[in-house]
Amino acid sequence: MDNEIFQKIFDILQPVLPTGWKKMVLFVGYTAGSYTMKYYTCDNQGIFTDCFSQSGINRAQLIKLFMSIDKAVTPERKKLDGKNKWSVLTMIVTDDGKMKTDFDYTDISDNAIAYEQSWKEKYIK
């Protein structure tokens, strides 16, 4: 996947990020036939807020947002062969424009909840 797709993802998210955000961490996880997404924003005091707890956006709006991200990501994932097809994308963006992405190729189908918890311990700090 190239930088263009990452910019597209950020362009989808940027309008709903809260005022004063310093860092945004996005989790995109795919299992057989489904996906899960969530993002966290960090303020200038180092406090992370889960997107589902963010004021100014409701669950229906988030689901629509995540569907737009999936629509952008899925064609790119389909181009990848089996061994290069990632199951989890982590995207970290700071308010100064720095962007970092990590990919995990582990099949999370059988333990998605446990995986997401360990992911959170790694990235949300």
Predicted regions located by residue number:
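Contiguous interface-forming segments/domains that mediate binding rather than catalysis
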Residues: 1-125
